[in-house]
Amino acid sequence: MSIQVHDTLTAQKRELVPLEPGKLRLYVCGPTVYDYSHLGHARCYVVWDVVVRHLRARGLEVRFVRNFTDVDDKIIQRANERGEDPIALASRFADAFHEDMDALGNLRPDVEPRVSGHIPEIVALIARLVERGFAYAPGNGDVYYAVRKFPEYGRLSKRNLDDLIAGARVEPGEAKRDPLDFALWKAAKPGEPAWESPWGKGRPGWHIECSAMTQKHLGAPIDLHAGGKDLVFPHHTNEIAQSVAATSDGLHAEDFARYWMHNGFVQIDDEKMSKSLGNFFTIRDVLARFDGEALRFFLLGTHYRRDFNFSDQVLAEAERRLSALYETVEKAERLGAGAAPAAEPAFVERARAALDDDFNTPQVLGIVAEAFTEANALADRKGKKSSEEKARLAAFARGARAVGAVLGILDRPPAQALTAIRDRAAARRGIDGGEVERSIAERAAARAAKDFARSDAIRDALLARGVVLMDGPQGTTWKVE
């Protein structure tokens, strides 16, 4: 087994080799909790959830840490607008974030540290940087990192200092020695949360938080650091500078994290999703209209490093494909029930290999689609199933569930999933499920009375509204086209 990942630091695909055999330490930058999570968060955290699932399925003991930033300028601004305590506001939106992640089927990290609970560690790390000459306190209560002291500052982002200086500036009231320097500690301001420090009361800057929490919960160096590609600069660039300067004499980026992985953006009509453009969707906006597993399935259809376009149309198509997968699993489990165990289908190992190759989920879904086509052909073949055919169907169903467990899909009873997906689709189309059920009952009565003209008329009327009836041994069920 060899797992290959695209490493942002080296811009190459590399074999993922943990520092300690059999164990892997992963840190993912979590959300700044000042509002409900958006589709970009859904994409990001589904990606890293699949990474964790696959690494564990491959036998690695993964320690997964993802933080909450609950002390930040945006949180303070939002809290002031609402007349609310900043920490309380952040806690409320952290709870909402958990609800959204649960709806998407994401596993909880092993540790979820919060900035507000790690102030002593942050202060100690800043003091260490000052002691080592990488940070300075100009005397106004702020502390800054001296960027030019760190020789590999632009290595992750592939930027040099000359390029960066053109866009750098010193804000009024700042006491930076260099426009490139960034704040590690900010002096207290009225109405803001603040903590004691050697430089006076204040609060941490954004970047130092993750460095301190990574070191406390994973040590240094760690194996893998991940997040959205918008964090490459400045956040992850600054994390490297802080963490390496505090813990290593070699001053190489690998002394903090051996590998760096970043996921792409969610776009709307080829533009990055943003509130200013009016194309912003929260996870809750989408889950009010679509099933959570369908959204997850949709997100897995694009390689994690690529940007992709979101629309209701493509999500509805993903929902339809997921329903088809569940229909096939239902048939395979029903027809293969009680069959003697068969060998694991070849598609399962092919799926593992695709995930080993930089977590290629679109390729996995393509492999699964091929296998489902074969399973459908076998399940729909007329006549009684042989013992061998039943065993093949049972093996397919187990294989589908195994691949699904790594992707975080196909984990519900088919009837439950199909009903949930159908009901969301019906609601979007303005179809009343109760009315459909009454029409089905009326059609059943017409058929019992041999009034087939009436039966066909009811069926055709429902079909015209996008409702497809399916007659089976257990009665009539329905779905939305």
Curated annotation (Swiss-Prot):
Classification via Pfam families: CysS_C, DALR_2, tRNA-synt_1e
Cellular compartments per GO CC: cytosol
GO molecular function list: ATP binding; cysteine-tRNA ligase activity; zinc ion binding
UniProt key word Cell membrane: no
Listed cofactors: Zn(2+)
Catalytic reactions of this protein: tRNA(Cys) + L-cysteine + ATP = L-cysteinyl-tRNA(Cys) + AMP + diphosphate
One GO term of the biological process aspect: cysteinyl-tRNA aminoacylation
Residues annotated for Zn(2+) binding in this entry: C29, C210, H235, E239
Motif window: 'HIGH' region: 31-41
Coiled-coil stretches noted in the UniProt entry, renumbered to this chain: none
List of residues binding ATP: K275
Cofactor note text: Binds 1 zinc ion per subunit.
Enzyme class, UniProt record, top EC level: ligase
Motif residue range(s): 'KMSKS' region: 272-276
Keywords for the protein's UniProt record, in alphabetical order: Aminoacyl-tRNA synthetase, ATP-binding, Cytoplasm, Ligase, Metal-binding, Nucleotide-binding, Protein biosynthesis, Zinc
Record keyword Isomerase present: no
Localization in the cell: Cytoplasm
Chief place where the protein resides: cytoplasm
EC number(s) recorded for this UniProt protein: 6.1.1.16
Similarity-based family: Belongs to the class-I aminoacyl-tRNA synthetase family.
Assembly notes: Monomer.
Protein name in the entry: Cysteine--tRNA ligase
Gene name linked to the record: cysS
